[in-house]
């Protein structure tokens, strides 16, 4: 193996470890908000939540879940989420830098437009590629978080039980329910998430962005994650709804398009944004991922990464 290939492998492993660690820490911190967001988003498609028992908002959801299922239940599905999130973020960050070498041919100073487009393409392509590998884990995490049962009334006892139960009933296709719309949504989100962050740092902080303060990086990351979350949220709502009908005898939506149409006509356009406020708050975790990743790179003396040119 040539020295160049060895360096590439070493860089890939390094990016995977740092990105995954940063992601796992931030996800655990915002896990309660993550679960509330998912419950608000999918409750209309849940067989466990009757229409007259649906949560009225963030506060109502927090209070009722804590009271009915216990405070610890706010972290339900978190272990699965961390397991899922480690490879997801690791692959996103690692693939992003590989795609970046291909798509980003200009610096922000040389050509801001091409620099921005290159970052959008590299970020989006990284998200779409990694999604293919980890989608069943993301699917299981959603179903576990949406399970509001207690004791024997729970739908699934854990990650393994969830995956095996859906697989036995629907086969592999059941674990990829909503995958099509997910690709579009993840591309939009990751494009804005990575592309916006790298571009903003390059333009606002200049070529010495690696020396940027923690708070400057966090401020940029916070704005970027909020915007990315809002833009891609309708895609996320549709894919979560599609996930909820896997393993069920009664099919709510015949296709992804049917899901878009029924949500819009039966619940109204605002239904696509249920839980969006929780998502914006949760975005702090996404901002932390970007900043923690950069800080770890600084501490370890690595070049490249999220904040690289």
UniProtKB/Swiss-Prot annotation:
Q: Where is this motif: Nucleotide carrier signature motif?
A: 239-244
What Gene3D superfamilies does the record point to?
A: Mitochondrial carrier domain (1.50.40.10)
Catalysed reaction(s)? ADP(in) + ATP(out) = ADP(out) + ATP(in)
Q: Which GO terms describe its molecular function?
A: ATP:ADP antiporter activity
Q: Which domain of life is it from?
A: Eukaryota
User: What does this protein's UniProt record list under function?
Assistant: ADP:ATP antiporter that mediates import of ADP into the mitochondrial matrix for ATP synthesis, and export of ATP out to fuel the cell. Cycles between the cytoplasmic-open state (c-state) and the matrix-open state (m-state): operates by the alternating access mechanism with a single substrate-binding site intermittently exposed to either the cytosolic (c-state) or matrix (m-state) side of the inner mitochondrial membrane.
Activity regulation text: The matrix-open state (m-state) is inhibited by the membrane-permeable bongkrekic acid (BKA). The cytoplasmic-open state (c-state) is inhibited by the membrane-impermeable toxic inhibitor carboxyatractyloside (CATR).
Query: What does the comment on domains in this protein's record state?
Result: The transmembrane helices are not perpendicular to the plane of the membrane, but cross the membrane at an angle. Odd-numbered transmembrane helices exhibit a sharp kink, due to the presence of a conserved proline residue.
Would you tell me the protein name for this molecule? Answer: Mitochondrial substrate carrier family protein ancA
Annotated ADP binding lies at 84, 96, 239
Checking Pfam families in the record gives: Mito_carr (PF00153)
A GO term from the CC aspect: extracellular matrix
Its transmembrane ranges are 12-41, 79-103, 113-133, 181-201, 215-235, 276-293
InterPro entries from the entry?
A: ADT_euk_type, Mit_carrier, Mitochondrial_sb/sol_carrier, Mt_carrier_dom_sf
For the keyword NAD, the answer is no
The protein's UniProt keywords, in alphabetical order, are:
Antiport, Membrane, Mitochondrion, Mitochondrion inner membrane, Repeat, Transmembrane, Transmembrane helix, Transport
- Which cell locations does it reside in? Mitochondrion inner membrane
Region annotation Important for transport activity: residue ranges?
A: 239-244
Describe its partners and assembly state: Monomer.
GO BP terms: ADP transport; ATP transport; mitochondrial ADP transmembrane transport; mitochondrial ATP transmembrane transport
């Amino acid at each position: 193996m040539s020295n160049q290939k060895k360096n590439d492998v070493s860089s890939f492993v390094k990016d995977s470890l740092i990105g995954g660690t940063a992601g796992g820490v931030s996800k655990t911190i915002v896990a309660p908000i993550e679960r509330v967001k998912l419950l608000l988003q999918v409750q209309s498609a849940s067989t466990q939540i009757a229409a007259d028992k649906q949560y009225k908002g963030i506060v109502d959801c927090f209070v009722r879940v804590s009271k009915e299922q216990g405070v610890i239940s706010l972290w339900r599905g978190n272990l699965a989420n961390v397991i899922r999130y480690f490879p997801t973020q690791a692959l996103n960050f690692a693939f992003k830098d590989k795609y970046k070498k291909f798509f980003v041919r200009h610096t922000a100073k040389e050509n801001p437009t091409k620099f921005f487009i290159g970052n959008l393409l590299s970020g989006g392509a990284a998200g779409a590629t990694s999604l293919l590998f980890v989608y069943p884990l993301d699917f299981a995490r959603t179903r576990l978080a949406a399970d509001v049962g207690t004791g024997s009334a729970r739908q699934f006892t854990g990650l393994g039980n969830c995956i095996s139960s859906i697989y036995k009933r629907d086969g592999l296709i059941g674990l990829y329910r909503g995958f099509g719309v997910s690709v579009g949504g993840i591309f939009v989100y990751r494009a804005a998430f990575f592309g916006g962050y790298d571009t903003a740092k390059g333009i606002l902080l200049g070529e010495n962005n690696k020396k940027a303060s923690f708070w400057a990086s966090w401020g940029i990351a916070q704005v970027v994650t909020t915007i990315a979350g809002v833009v891609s949220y309708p895609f996320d709502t549709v894919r979560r709804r599609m996930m909820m009908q896997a393993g069920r005898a009664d099919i709510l939506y015949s296709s992804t398009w049917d899901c878009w149409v029924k949500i819009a006509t039966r619940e109204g356009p605002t239904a696509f944004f249920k839980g969006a406020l929780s998502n914006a708050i949760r975005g702090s975790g996404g901002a932390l991922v970007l900043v923690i990743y950069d800080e770890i790179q600084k501490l370890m003396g690595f070049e490249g990464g999220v904040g690289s040119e």
